[in-house]
C-alpha cells in the first residue's frame, strides 16, 4: 500500500490523508463553530431544568424501545446514550467481511422515539479502543450541521448533544465527519429517529391510527472491493481497506444492498412476527440511496413515504419511494397468514444483492380474499 494512503491513527484523526483524497463536501467543524453563533444558554437551561427527564434504554433493530404512542403530559428531556463501535462484520453467507462503523454495535443504529417538542439529549461515546473520529448528524435537528459540528469525538472522547424535536416524522441520523462522510455512512454508521405527534398518528381524515407492533428496517449499501479474480478482499483494518473501498464507492455500484446489516438478517428464525389482524408500523431508512419498499402479498394501508407526519398519509400503496437520505413509514393491517416477503422492488437489489426480509404471519386463512379455484395440474 502506498504511503499516500497509509492511514495511521494520527493521520485519520487529523483528517489529512482522507481530506486529500476526498474534497470535503461538508463545511469544516472549525468554520461551523467559528461562525459567531450567539446563544441564550442561560434562559434555555433554566427552562429545561424544570422539565421531567426520562432515560431510555435503546434496543437493537428491528425492534424499538418501549414508548407511548401519545405524549403524556408536558414535553420532556429524553436521555439516550450510544457508544460507537468499529467492528468487523460478515454481510453474507459467503463470509464477506466489512469493517463496519456503527452506533451501538448494530447496522442500522438503534431507533430512537420521542414526541414532538420533546428534547433529545444524546450522550455519544467514542471509546479509546476505536481508531477513527466520529460525530452524529440528525436530520430531525435544526442547526450546527444537524449536531455534527457539536459532536466531533476522537477516540476516548464523549459528547452530550441536546436538541428540540420540532418536526414530527421519521428521520435519518448518520455520522458526518468532514471529508469522510460517504465512507462512514456506507460503512453502516446510520440509523433513524421517530418523532411522534403529541396526539399520535392520524389518517388522512384526522382519525387516530394505533399500531400493535412497530419494526425498524434499515437498508444499507456496502461497497466491498474485489481482487483481480473477482473475489471479495479482506483487510486487517478500516484504514487498510480505505483506498480500495473509496474506489469501489466511486463506481456507485454496491456489492451488497441489505436489510439490517446482512443478507438474510430478517429471514428464517429472524423473520418479523405478526398475527392476522395486527396493525403493524414499518419504519424504513436508507441514508444513501433511493429505495422502493414493497410488501409482497400485502400493501401500505397508510404510507408516509418520506416519513413526515404533518402530511396526510397516502392510501393503499403497492410500492412506495423513499429517497436516499430519508426514512419512511408504512402502516398495514395483516389479513392473511403466511410468509410475506418485504423487499426493495428494484428486484435485482432484492434477489441478487440482499435487500429482502420476511414477515411471518399466523392466523386463519380467509377464502373470501383469495382461494385456489383450480389447483395447478399437469396435462
UniProtKB/Swiss-Prot annotation:
Binds 1 Cu(2+) ion. The Cu(2+) ion is held by residues from each of 2 monomers of the trimer. Nitrite is bound to the Cu(2+) ion site. Pseudoazurin is the physiological electron donor for the Cu-NIR in vitro. Keywords: Copper, FAD, Flavoprotein, Metal-binding, Nitrate assimilation, Oxidoreductase, Periplasm, Repeat, Signal. It comes from the Bacteria. Its cofactor is Cu(2+); Cu(+); FAD. Cu cation 1 binds at residues 134, 175, 184, 189. GO terms for biological process: denitrification pathway; nitrate assimilation. Disulfide bonds: none annotated. Pathway: Nitrogen metabolism; nitrate reduction (denitrification); dinitrogen from nitrate: step 2/4. Cu cation 2 binds at residues 139, 174, 345. Predicted to be exported by the Tat system. The position of the signal peptide cleavage has not been experimentally proven. It catalyses: nitric oxide + Fe(III)-[cytochrome c] + H2O = Fe(II)-[cytochrome c] + nitrite + 2 H(+). It is found in: Periplasm. GO terms for cellular component: periplasmic space. Its EC number is 1.7.2.1. Residues 33-214, 215-379 form the Plastocyanin-like domain. Homotrimer. Belongs to the multicopper oxidase family. The type I copper site in NIR plays a crucial role for electron transfer from pseudoazurin to the type II copper site of NIR, which comprises the catalytic center of NIR for the reduction of nitrite. This is Copper-containing nitrite reductase.
